[in-house]
Regions:
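Domain-start "cap" segments at the beginnings of catalytic or binding domains
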Residues: 112-113, 117-156
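His/Asp/Glu-enriched short active-site or ligand-binding loop at hydrolase and phosphoryl-transfer sites
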Residues: 140-180, 215-222
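Catalytic grooves of carbohydrate-active enzymes
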Residues: 182-195, 199-222
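Short histidine/acidic/glycine/proline-rich micro-motifs that form metal-
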Residues: 66-69, 92-95, 140, 161-164, ...
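Active-site beta->alpha N-cap acidic-glycine motif
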Residues: 5-97, 103, 110, 114, ...
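Alpha-helical scaffolding segments of alpha/beta enzyme cores, especially the outer helices
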Residues: 48-51, 74-81, 106, 110-113, ...
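Short beta-strands and strand-loop turn motifs
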Residues: 88-90, 156-160, 187-192
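Divalent metal-coordination and catalytic microenvironments
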Residues: 38, 53, 62, 86, ...
Length: 222
């Protein structure tokens, strides 16, 4: 039986051209993959991700929801202590299309503040700074929000979307669709969320093993 893969796994160049200031893919010809995880930290999913990454000495970028950082400071600390990059995914994960420019910028500001405060409160976090990386929830921004934010943050979207949040897909399909679309420097979106976890726990080990066996490295965006 033929596998049915989701559409739009690979971001078309025509879409990238609409927002040239966005980081879609890292500029490298080396065999390096940039795994990113949205919507954490949450206890079970994020802890699983950290354990899997450690097996392969892999680094990644975690786009954190500010409210989840507030709820789970211990998990956030584990992410930082493991040497991963933490970045802004707004305070409450609301689509930019649903908020005014002012309200959306406040969502971003609140998340940035809690990231900075959480890092400063850590015993070894005094020298760590929260990054100025930002990923909009759902990848959705109004033009006015985009114009404002690109002056203060490096907006990061993706080259490959895993669709691990899709309840109709299996973890195997998620892994295979990522593997078929990755190239050097690809930024891949996965989710350390409760919703995505049933697929993530199948897909992530397969992705890590596949690329590690072929000599790839896994790096964070800095």
């Amino acid at each position: 039986m033929n596998k049915v893969f989701p559409l739009w796994v690979k971001t078309p160049r025509s879409i990238r051209a609409l927002m040239p200031d966005v980081l879609w893919q890292m500029p490298t010809k080396d065999k390096v993959l940039y795994l990113t995880f949205d919507d954490g930290p949450v206890p079970e999913a994020t802890s699983f991700v950290l354990a899997q990454l450690e097996k392969y000495n892999a680094k990644a970028t975690f786009f954190c929801i500010g409210d989840n950082v507030r709820k789970h400071p211990d998990i956030f600390q584990q992410v930082v202590n493991a040497g991963h990059t933490v970045a802004n995914h707004t305070m409450h994960h609301i689509s930019g299309w649903e908020l005014s420019e002012e309200a959306y910028l406040e969502e971003v500001k609140l998340c940035q503040e809690i990231l900075s405060q959480s890092l400063a409160a850590m015993a070894n976090g005094g020298t760590k700074k929260s990054t100025k990386l930002f990923r909009p929830p759902y990848g959705k921004l109004k033009p006015s929000q985009y114009r404002k934010l690109k002056n203060s943050y490096q907006i990061v979207l993706w080259d490959v979307l895993s669709y691990d949040f899709d309840l109709n897909l299996s973890g195997e399909i998620v892994a295979d669709s990522v593997i078929q679309n990755v190239e050097q420097g690809s930024i891949v979106v996965l989710h350390d969320s409760v919703k995505a976890f049933p697929r993530l726990q199948v897909a992530l080990p397969k992705i890590l093993q596949y690329y590690a066996e072929r000599g790839w490295k896994f790096a964070s965006i800095v």
